[in-house]
Every structure is written in C-alpha cells, then in structure tokens.
Amino acid sequence: MDSNTVSSFQVDCFLWHVRKRFADQEMGDAPFLDRLRRDQKSLGGRGSTLGLDIETATRAGKQIVERILEEESDEALKMTIASAPASRYLTDMTLEEMSRDWFMLMPKQKVAGSLCIRMDQAIMDKNITLKANFSIIFDRLETLILLRAFTEEGAIVGEISPLPSLPGHTDEDVKNAIGVLIGGLEWNDNTVRVSETLQRFAWRSSNEDRRPPLPTKQKRKMARTIESEV
C-alpha cells in the first residue's frame, strides 16, 4: 500500500476529529455540519477499503499534523492562505431537505464514475425541479455534495450523490450524471427543470425551461442505459 495514501487517510481522520469537536460545541453552521456528516461516511468507506482502523489512524494523523505545525512559521502560513484559491459553498436545499429519508416504488440506480444516480421510475407526469448543494471555485462547480429531484408537492423522486468509497469528481462528471437523471425522469413524461443556482454554475447556456439543452435521442439513450444496466 502506498505510504502517501495511508498518511493522507490518517491526516483526514484527525482533521475530521478536530471538526467534530468544534461541532460538538455547537459552533458549526449548516454547510459545516453537512460536510462533516458526509466526510464521516467517506472516511468509513476509505477505512474499509484500506483495511485501516479509524481510531488508530486518527492518532497517527495527530502526530503528523503536530509535526507540521511545529515546523510552520506564521509567515509561511500567511503566504499559503493568500495563494490558495477560495471556494464557496452554495445551497439550494435546506438541511431538512438534505437529510430527509425518501422511498422509491420502482427504484432504479446507476453508478457513473464516483457518483450514484437513483430515481423512482414510478413517477409520471410531474413537474420536477433539481436542487443541489455544492461548492464552486473560479465560478465553476467544484464538488457536488448532494443533488435531489423534487416534485411541486415537495416529494423527493431522484438523487445524485458522491460514493463515499470513491472520492473525487469533475464538473463534467456531475453534468453527465444530471443528464442521466433528467433522461430517466423525462422518459415517463415528467417535466424537469434545473435550479437557477445549479444552472448558473454547471452550464453556461440554457433553454427557456431553465435547464441544459438535451436532444431527444440523447434523453432516450440515457434512459435506456439506466434500465439495461440496473
């Protein structure tokens, strides 16, 4: 096993522990708590994949961080902060909408890279809006936290989420996954729209329905792909 992979996991475990202690003091805001919850799942998946105990890794990560801090000067820290590009966290959904459990009458699921696409194929003739919580950098989508499809009544009928065991995805991965979700939902004559926030940072152009252009043949091809691969 690569030593960098192990040490990276150890540092991530310790930093999560620090953030958890911070949250336990009721000092974290909604985006902070959301990332904390999702990173916990990610660490669990990585730990299982690597065969490493999280508690042991956390202690080792603490030693690594302490050693770095001992060698770090205040001036070097200022330079690092100044040179690092800043990302922003954008939210379409409330914490309740993100954490709400939902159920599917006719479940369909597809894994696309490091993203999992789920939808209820029993939903028909509905007006559906896609909402997402995500971070951006340089005015482009950086990391998808969670995307969900909502009916006008507020029911959740679809979802795109990162796989905890496979971290890392690009904005193109997200756009492709959204295309698959839209194609699957529209197969049952649903009308799908993308939220203005997601539209702005995921695509540079849109049609009058506030959603990315998607040819009919492409929609049908992606919908068939879901049915054939599940």
Swiss-Prot record:
A motif (Nuclear export signal) lies at residues 137-146. One of its GO terms (cellular component) is host cell cytoplasm. Residues 205-230 are annotated as: Disordered. Upon interferon induction, ISGylated via host HERC5; this results in the impairment of NS1 interaction with RNA targets due to its inability to form homodimers and to interact with host EIF2AK2/PKR. Its main location: host cell. The dsRNA-binding region is required for suppression of RNA silencing. Homodimer. Interacts with host TRIM25 (via coiled coil); this interaction specifically inhibits TRIM25 multimerization and TRIM25-mediated RIGI CARD ubiquitination. Interacts with human EIF2AK2/PKR, CPSF4, IVNS1ABP and PABPN1. Inhibits post-transcriptional processing of cellular pre-mRNA, by binding and inhibiting two cellular proteins that are required for the 3'-end processing of cellular pre-mRNAs: the 30 kDa cleavage and polyadenylation specificity factor/CPSF4 and the poly(A)-binding protein 2/PABPN1. In turn, unprocessed 3' end pre-mRNAs accumulate in the host nucleus and are no longer exported to the cytoplasm. Cellular protein synthesis is thereby shut off very early after virus infection. This is Non-structural protein 1.
